[in-house]
Amino acid sequence: MPLSFEGTFKAKRNVNLGGKRVSNDRAQLLRKAAMERKNREEERKAENNSVAVQSLSRGFLARRKFKQDFRERWIYKYTKSGRTSIRFNTLEDIKCSISLLVLFAEPDIDLPFVSQVAHNILVWLENLIPLSNGMDDTPKSHLKVKILKVQETLSNSNDSWLWQRFSSLLLNCLVSSINSHRIEGTDTSAETSLLHCLAYVAPYLKSSELSTYYDSVMTFYAQIYPKQNMTNLEDIMSLSLLTPVSSKTDENANSSSAFLFHVLASDCFSSIENCIPPDLIIDKVFSSSLQLSEEACISSLLNLGMIKVFSLAGNCLHLLHTEYKNSSLWKFCSYILDALYVFSGESVNSRIQVVSDVDDDEDDENAFSQNYYSHLQMVAKHFSKNYANQSGIVQRSFAECISSTFITKAFKLVSSNTLQAMSHFYATMIKLFPSNRTSILMYISLVETNEGSLTRSFSRFSWDMFSESPVYQLFHKKFDVQNVLKNDSGYWFQLQLLIDVYSRMLFTMIDDEFHNDKQNPLYPVMAEFCTVLKNLVLGLYWDVQAAKDVDCKSVVDISQLRVSSTSLLQQLYRINSRKQFLPEDFFLMSEYFNLNEFEANALQESELASHAEAEINITYKFDNFSESRPRLNILNNCSFFLPFHFRIHLLQQLLLLDKQANGYAQPFGHLKHAVIRRNRIFDDGFDAFYNFGKLLKGPIRITFVDEHGVVEEGIDGGGLTKEFLTSICKTVFDINYGLFSETKAHLLYPNTHAYAQDVERLRCYEFLGMLIGKCIYEGIQIDAAFASFFVAKWLGHPSYFDDLTSLDPNLYEGLVFLKNYDGDVENDMALNFTVVHEEFGVRNVIDLIPNGSNISVTNENRLQYIHLVSNYYLNARLSRQCRAFTNGFTQIIDPHWLAMFHESEIQILVGGDPVPIDIDDLRRHTVYAGGYEPNSPTIVLFWEVLREFEEEDKRSFVKFVTSVARPPILGFKALMPSFCIRVNGEDETRLPTASTCVNLLKLPMYSTKQTLRDKLLTAVRSGVGFGFS
């Protein structure tokens, strides 16, 4: 590239004629412009504020001058030497005076003028009201005349705006006087005139001023009462309290609400209630105030705060003692109780699970599921703590409402108008006072209602009213929670109390009385009543989310309704099981379910529940309700909605899932081996397996040692395990062994002797529970029948008086005689609250209640005595043994699985189905070995002979080959291993033998039918199987 050289070596200078450029001058300019805009905006605001202040100042000064001018004019016209010099002769005189007065009067400055005007208006008003000379010359009638006359006079003036301004002025002056403590002086004439005059014009107050008005009235009374005789002020207090609510203005409902929440909620109302006719409060206040919605009314109560609501409760409940025929008062009192329940529940976690040990079913029906009952207990405890701090007036008002005298008086005159509100009231009351639940329900159940010429028990009256209601038709199918429960709450409280009362009646009603329509008022309509209950219960358990949504938005306690209705339905199902009074399959509701889908979803819910409980890793009493498990809810609480065989199949699937989850599905996996001496079978079994706990679910392997100490040959493929379980149960269920006793019907229950309650024996009962659970877990049936009251303990169900008939029929008949005795129980029978327990010749007297030996049984307390005696024999004596047995049983069988069945169904689970033996079913599920085939001559003869057996001989044969006289629940297809017939030689002189451990019949090859019959009958009637030939 060519280079050029021009004689210079410096770069050319760059000259910028625009001046030096700064790189950030743009950003700086933007900031400067923003600052200038801000300064200009602030200047504009300052100028506007200055103008506004100047305007306000000029306005204030102008108004002050304006008021002062009017004040001077009014003083010049109406005063002389500082006193009013005019008497009002006409309404126009009054209007002329106050039209000026309201323009300038200020409470702090013009109080003397306002009080003087008020005094003179009162003088004029008193002249309007004539002296009473009629027949009804009472303070109450005189008060009504005053109010009506003044309202009529003022309303005709067509100047409501003026009276509104004047009433506001009077109120402001009264408030100012109270706040400045002027009333504490000796002279209160000015304030009394203000209040008296204000009482007449109070209907013109704005709704926003009513609360202040009533607060001022009560404060005035509270401050003046200790210093003056109230007799002179009774008329003024009556007028001031009742005039607003007695007016015919549009503000009447607001006045009534203000009266309720600011007068009746005052703790000093009880001292002035004599000034106010109760019927005026009832007619004017409650009927108008309840135009408010349920939610608005309760919301207003909650805004008052708990202390005020307690005061309100005391005053309203006191009114209720005399005005118990008024439905509006009952309804409002119900709302008050709802508010107190909400206050008490705010600090309680409604889903805390509390472990409680309820052994003695000593009180009521145990109607509540564990979680909900615990929640109620905590709410009631919180309420009781606050209740204890209330005044004696409040406590006496509550005590009166739950007394026998008041309940009898009120419910005797219950009507269709008051029924729902009274039901609401007492349904909430028994939640706040759970210790009085039993007595309240008993008092109500004993009442005979009188409506017109018809006398009925409360339960029948309530049912008749409900069956005539528009919602009754909704219960003829599955209950639609979402669309029904959110409205018409009165019907649900009515149904709630009916359920509670009838449950209490059943608790003291024996079966014979239940089936007598003279002693059981609902017996003629029992089918309809049970239809309502089952459809209600199904809806509440199935539509869980809908019920939860309604529970959040409604005053109806859905949980209480669900628990109570479920408990009653379960009671009625048990009664029907003992003696049927409903059609066959009445309780089945399977038409509402696709059983295949139900089973699949129930298995999924159970698996999720098992995982959740495993993660929690705590021990607690199982809860039979969960919002996330609707199908398990139904299975655990009302399993009778579904067919029994469906539930059996579902149980088998649950057991299979549990085995798979724990690795027990393989028969030879994780074997636990034990050597068992036949003559020490229980002791060796206890030593080998007691400490296994839940691990006993897994496969076990048994080696037997005979009575000579020789180890028996054989590999345990399940048969020896079955023989071990059936043999050990046969041993301990023998009453001579000492662990069990039997009823006259040969039904087993734990021994009640003292030695049965020592620690070692209780461990034996726990082990037996584990063994029975193991039998069910493995599908092994045992030949044992248990008393229903004992099986009920496995389910956590209480035992009832009628269960005594199976334990001790003589005792049962004696208590029934006592219950129905018409004479003088105390003198004729000379009983006291004790029982005599004799053991090994030693008699012990046991008190049923403290100092029971000194308390006589009377006509009044005999039901308590009957209940306590039943509880002692069915519960107290058995509690420790049953608890130990159940603890062992539930280690193997999940309580949720167990809850799917009724007592009688669990007996079938343990010992098989008490149905006739189906020989054809047995033949279809038989296998052959050793040379026999289905068409072998001996086999053909065998089935002919077996089919001709009597039913008793058929059962003996089944017991001969399986160890149990009843077939499996799902038929012989469920027999494991399958029934097998094997050749046992050709010697026809030998008898058939059996190996019950593997359901095996060893049958010689008999050639004639008669020989086969004789030999088979001899074998099965002998009761001996293995080795007998």
UniProtKB/Swiss-Prot annotation:
- Show the Gene3D superfamilies listed in the entry: Hect, E3 ligase catalytic domain (3.30.2410.10), Hect, E3 ligase catalytic domains (3.90.1750.10)
HECT domain boundaries: 692-1029
Q: Where is the IQ domain?
A: 46-75
Keyword line: Cytoplasm, Nucleus, Transferase, Ubl conjugation pathway
Catalytic residues at C997 (glycyl thioester intermediate)
Q: What is its EC number?
A: 2.3.2.26
* Entry's induction text: By stress.
Q: Name one GO cellular component term.
A: cytosol
Report TM segments. Answer: none
> Which cysteines are cross-linked by disulfides?
none
Q: What class of enzyme is it?
A: transferase
Query: For this UniProt entry, what is the primary localization, expressed as one broad class?
Result: cytoplasm
Task: State its location(s).
Answer: Cytoplasm; Nucleus
Q: What GO annotations for molecular function exist for this entry?
A: ubiquitin protein ligase activity; zinc ion binding
Which terms under GO biological process does the entry name? ERAD pathway; protein polyubiquitination; ubiquitin-dependent protein catabolic process
The record's section on Pfam families has:
HECT
Q: Which reaction does it catalyse?
A: S-ubiquitinyl-[E2 ubiquitin-conjugating enzyme]-L-cysteine + [acceptor protein]-L-lysine = [E2 ubiquitin-conjugating enzyme]-L-cysteine + N(6)-ubiquitinyl-[acceptor protein]-L-lysine
Function as written in the Swiss-Prot or TrEMBL entry: Probable E3 ubiquitin-protein ligase which mediates ubiquitination and subsequent proteasomal degradation of target proteins.
Q: What is this protein called?
A: Probable E3 ubiquitin protein ligase C167.07c
